[in-house]
């Protein structure tokens, strides 16, 4: 299993993509909206990807809900994380969050997709990149909601990815466009933001973690996603996390501080990442594959989905019908509340 996760251009594979997927360093593939036309096409694309690849790839997507949902038409419209507690309260919201985790994971597993990068564990709604993707501004309540969603995902047969360690919720800058700084004291970052990750790791509820492309100058001069302090000293050492560490997308402007694509990839692996994401830049991905030293990402093999059922079997179930309707309704209520 190789340590590189990359993407493909369209609805089906071209010859160059088949060649790239057969590279021994490729271990994962992430799907985007541009790869989706309809459920039958998506299922066929995943089949082509599995067919072309040398390794048994981890196929991933961002299908967390709210504004980050790559596949919409033909799938349940998932509400934003913030909406569960905000509109339903902690008890009712928690129950539906668990069902949302189950439904989201089930809809993806029916497509033979292994993981959706979820849940978001960032605390608070002020960040441009996070906002409504956060469950709550109170760490304890965010933890409770995330716990429900995670349990639903696990029940469906999907592994979880907590993001963005140690917490992206308090920075207003968007790391897709620049490298944000979080100048708050170390004690606040650790006791407020990191507390959610710490609890879920102790409970063994997180199978993977995606670190933030954020610099916390009070603790380390490098972005957490490329920092041995955050990934090795804190995450592995102090918190005892033994799951998969993903880099965030090395094509984001926030990662440019780490040099060329090959340098960014190597720096992320050296810092402690198991798998690096190189998306939306074919040249960058090829450069990483050409220049990275051969390495195996054994931990990543733990992320394959469990269960095998068709989309039709899922949609015929009473549980899916009930939960799908509830989630669509909450999504509509949330959109209305935001525009009021």
Curated annotation (Swiss-Prot):
Q: Name one Pfam family in it.
A: Glyco_hydro_3
UniProt binding sites for substrate:
62, 70, 133, 163-164
The cross-references to SUPFAM superfamilies, in alphabetical order and at most eight, read: (Trans)glycosidases
Q: Which UniProt keywords apply?
A: Cell cycle, Cell division, Cell shape, Cell wall biogenesis/degradation, Cytoplasm, Glycosidase, Hydrolase, Peptidoglycan synthesis
- What are the EC numbers? 3.2.1.52
Ranges in a coiled coil:
none
Looking at its record, which EC class is this enzyme? hydrolase
**UniProt pathway annotation:** Cell wall biogenesis; peptidoglycan recycling
List the GO molecular function terms: beta-N-acetylhexosaminidase activity
Show which residues constitute the signal peptide.
none
Entry annotation: catalytic residues? 176 (proton donor/acceptor), 248 (nucleophile)
Q: Where is this site: Important for catalytic activity?
A: 174
Question: According to its record, what are the GO cellular component terms?
Answer: cytoplasm
User: Biological process GO terms, please?
Assistant: carbohydrate metabolic process; cell division; cell wall organization; peptidoglycan biosynthetic process; peptidoglycan turnover; regulation of cell shape
- InterPro entries the UniProt entry points to: Beta_hexosaminidase_bac, Glyco_hydro_3_AS, Glyco_hydro_3_N, Glyco_hydro_3_N_sf, Glycoside_hydrolase_SF, NagZ_Beta-hexosaminidase
State its location(s): Cytoplasm
Catalytically driven reaction(s): Hydrolysis of terminal non-reducing N-acetyl-D-hexosamine residues in N-acetyl-beta-D-hexosaminides
Query: Which family does the entry's similarity section mention?
Result: Belongs to the glycosyl hydrolase 3 family. NagZ subfamily.
Q: What does this protein do?
A: Plays a role in peptidoglycan recycling by cleaving the terminal beta-1,4-linked N-acetylglucosamine (GlcNAc) from peptide-linked peptidoglycan fragments, giving rise to free GlcNAc, anhydro-N-acetylmuramic acid and anhydro-N-acetylmuramic acid-linked peptides.
Q: Which NCBIfam families match?
A: PRK05337.1 (NF003740)
For this entry, the protein name equals Beta-hexosaminidase
| Organism annotation | Klebsiella pneumoniae (strain 342)
Source species taxonomy: Bacteria, Pseudomonadati, Pseudomonadota, Gammaproteobacteria, Enterobacterales
């Amino acid at each position: 299993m190789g340590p590189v996760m990359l993407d493909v251009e369209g609805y089906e594979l071209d010859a160059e993509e088949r060649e790239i997927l057969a590279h021994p360093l490729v271990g994962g593939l992430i799907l985007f909206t541009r790869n989706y036309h309809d459920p039958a096409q998506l299922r066929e694309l995943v089949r082509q990807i599995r067919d072309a690849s040398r390794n048994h790839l981890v196929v991933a997507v961002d299908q967390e809900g709210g504004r980050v949902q790559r596949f919409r038409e033909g799938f349940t419209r998932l509400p934003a994380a913030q909406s569960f507690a905000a509109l339903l309260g902690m008890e009712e919201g928690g129950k539906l969050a668990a069902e949302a985790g189950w439904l989201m994971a089930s809809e993806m597993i029916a497509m033979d997709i292994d993981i959706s990068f979820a849940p978001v564990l960032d605390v608070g709604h002020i960040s441009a990149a996070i906002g409504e993707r956060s469950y709550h501004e109170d760490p304890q309540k965010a933890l409770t909601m995330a716990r429900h969603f995670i349990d639903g995902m696990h029940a469906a047969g999907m592994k979880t990815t907590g993001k963005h360690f140690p917490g992206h919720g308090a920075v207003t800058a968007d790391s897709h466009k620049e490298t944000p700084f979080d100048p708050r004291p170390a004690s606040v970052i650790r006791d407020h933001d990191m507390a959610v990750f710490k609890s879920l790791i102790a409970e063994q509820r997180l199978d993977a973690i995606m670190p933030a492309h954020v610099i916390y100058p009070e603790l380390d001069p490098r972005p957490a996603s490329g920092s041995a302090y955050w990934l090795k000293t804190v995450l592995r050492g102090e918190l005892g996390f033994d799951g998969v560490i993903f880099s965030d997308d090395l094509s984001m402007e926030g990662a440019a501080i780490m040099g060329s694509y090959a340098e960014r990839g190597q720096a992320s692996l050296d810092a402690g990442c198991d798998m690096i994401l190189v998306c939306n830049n074919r040249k960058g991905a090829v450069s990483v594959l050409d220049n990275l030293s051969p390495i195996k990402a054994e931990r990543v093999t733990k992320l394959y989905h469990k269960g095998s059922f068709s989309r039709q079997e899922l949609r015929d179930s009473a549980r899916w019908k009930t939960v799908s309707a509830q989630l669509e309704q909450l999504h509509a209520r949330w959109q209305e509340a935001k525009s009021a």
